[in-house]
């Protein structure tokens, strides 16, 4: 059920010099402001994502040439991405300065076949990052940096990967998917993207007032659960494959536990509750401490009027579920899932989004953030829908795999739910969950996973 990431073979690449790809048509220079959510300090981090394409013997086109040309055309519609990010001298906020510099584009080759790497499914993160372009960022200075870079890596089998580095400050996961979908549409021969890009960052700017900011988690600082395994730099990554049948059986058993419930549970509500509980056990969090599940809730359709379809900036709000470790342990999965469902609904309450935007502005003004022990904090993000915006077939069929990575130090506080690799037909309709934990805690996590699987699914295979 779980596969530990490891470099199956040495990944040696021959790289060509980086080039800057500019818009294919002239676009005017300007400086663009970002939204309150874009400016959240936690969003100034690079997304690294790898899209894996199998060889297509019938296609004699060069994917590098197609993607280079498509990128140049894309930047006419998404011209801010060919600018640079910097902080305003007047208020210290991020802004995109567009002078037409272009986007870093890198080409690499490998003598390996993608199949020998299991289509990068089990590669160690640090090895897989070689398939993604490097963007050097000094977050403490005001040095400009590119918000986007691409790397195309060709393999001996004829397959290739597209590696993207894209700053979270400019777009969220939905926005990343929208941009890459537009890129592959243009590479397939379309004259323009099917979805028109929209900036409109002013729609999500909070009003500034004189109230003090409320630091998330400050009300439980000193009460948060701790783990003997943390802190540590010895962190490992696991891919947990959960089949469609197992998810259905888990949902069915939970619905039997609470027949009074009028709404069914979503896959996210079920899996987040299940994994949160197992993670708490694996880390051996102290029973009286508080553990927190963070949930990102999309708000594109919540605003009045809703954000346009082509909006690619950050558009989500975090909500939280808080329990003591003992409460989490003693609660049924259905009870926890019901709490997750209720927490998600708070993001839709009138005034909640406006207040969250105001509070984010206050925290940035005061330069305040949570600095307490965060062993018991866990975010589980859902990439199943935002990772695939639409068809990406531009001559090599759909990607056989998608792999998000982190370019900062490995964090044990974030997990991801994704669609499974298409290289394994038995996983159709299922999910894969990526988890990072201290090495010893991961052993416990796998043991707990096997026990829970036997309880809910009736087997340990």
From Swiss-Prot:
Catalytic activity: 2 (E)-4-coumaroyl-CoA + spermidine = N(1),N(8)-bis(coumaroyl)-spermidine + 2 CoA + 2 H(+)
InterPro entries cross-referenced by the UniProt entry: CAT-like_dom_sf, Plant_acyltransferase
Enzyme Commission (EC) number: 2.3.1.249
Keywords associated with the record: Acyltransferase, Polyamine biosynthesis, Transferase
pH dependence: Optimum pH is 9 using spermidine and coumaroyl-CoA as substrates.
Any single Pfam family the record assigns to this protein: Transferase
Domain of life (superkingdom): Eukaryota
Active site: 168 (proton acceptor), 393 (proton acceptor)
Recorded coiled-coil stretches: none
Tissue: Mainly expressed in roots at low levels, specifically, in the root tip.
GO BP terms, alphabetized: polyamine biosynthetic process; spermidine metabolic process
Pathway: Amine and polyamine metabolism; spermidine metabolism
Sample GO molecular function, one term: spermidine:coumaroyl CoA N-acyltransferase activity
Function: Spermidine coumaroyl-CoA acyltransferase that mediates the conversion of spermidine into dicoumaroyl-spermidine.
Family statement drawn from the similarity comment of this UniProt entry: Belongs to the plant acyltransferase family.
Complex and partners: Monomer.
Protein name stated in the entry: Spermidine coumaroyl-CoA acyltransferase
Organism: Arabidopsis thaliana
Classification of source organism: Eukaryota, Viridiplantae, Streptophyta, Embryophyta, Tracheophyta
């Amino acid at each position: 059920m779980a596969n530990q990431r490891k470099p199956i073979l040495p990944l040696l690449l021959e790289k060509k010099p980086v080039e800057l790809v500019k818009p294919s048509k002239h676009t005017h220079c300007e400086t663009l402001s970002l939204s309150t959510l874009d400016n959240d300090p936690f969003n100034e981090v690079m997304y690294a994502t790898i899209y894996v394409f199998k060889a297509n013997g019938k296609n004699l086109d060069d994917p590098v040439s197609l993607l280079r040309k498509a990128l140049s055309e894309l930047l006419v519609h998404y011209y801010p991405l060919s600018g640079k990010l910097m902080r305003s001298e007047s208020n210290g906020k991020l802004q995109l300065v567009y002078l037409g510099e272009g986007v870093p584009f890198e080409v690499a080759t490998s003598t390996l076949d993608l199949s020998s790497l299991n289509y990068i499914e089990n590669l160690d993160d640090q090895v897989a990052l070689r398939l993604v372009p490097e963007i050097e960022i000094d977050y403490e200075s005001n040095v400009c940096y590119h918000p986007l870079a691409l790397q195309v890596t060709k393999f001996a089998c004829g397959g290739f990967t597209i590696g993207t580095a894209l700053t979270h400050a400019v777009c969220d996961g939905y926005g990343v998917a929208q941009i890459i979908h537009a890129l592959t549409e243009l590479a397939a021969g379309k004259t323009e993207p099917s979805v028109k890009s929209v900036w409109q960052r002013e729609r999500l700017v909070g009003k500034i007032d004189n109230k003090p900011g409320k630091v998330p988690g400050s009300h439980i600082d000193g009460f948060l659960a701790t783990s003997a395994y943390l802190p540590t730099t010895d962190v490992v990554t696991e891919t947990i494959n959960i089949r469609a049948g197992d998810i259905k059986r888990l949902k069915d058993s939970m619905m039997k536990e609470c027949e009074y419930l009028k709404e069914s549970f979503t896959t996210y509500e079920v899996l987040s509750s299940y994994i949160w509980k197992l993670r708490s056990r694996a880390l051996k969090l102290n029973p009286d401490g508080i553990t927190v599940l963070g949930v990102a809730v999309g708000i594109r359709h919540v605003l009045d009027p809703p954000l346009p379809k082509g909006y690619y900036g950050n558009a989500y709000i975090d909500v939280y579920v808080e329990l003591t470790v003992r409460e989490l342990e003693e609660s049924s999965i259905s009870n926890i899932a019901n709490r997750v469902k209720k927490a998600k609904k708070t993001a839709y309450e009138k005034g909640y989004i406006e207040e969250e935007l105001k509070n984010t502005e206050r925290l940035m003004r005061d330069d305040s953030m949570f600095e307490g022990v965060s062993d018991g904090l866990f975010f589980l993000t859902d990439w199943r829908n935002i990772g695939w915006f639409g068809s990406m077939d531009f001559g090599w069929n759909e990607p056989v795999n998608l792999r998000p990575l982190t370019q900062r130090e490995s964090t044990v506080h974030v997990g991801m739910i994704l669609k499974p690799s298409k290289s394994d037909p038995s996983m159709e309709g299922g999910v894969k969950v990526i988890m990072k934990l201290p090495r010893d805690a991961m052993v416990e996590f796998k043991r707990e996973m096997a026990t829970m699987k036997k309880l809910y699914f009736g087997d340990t295979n």
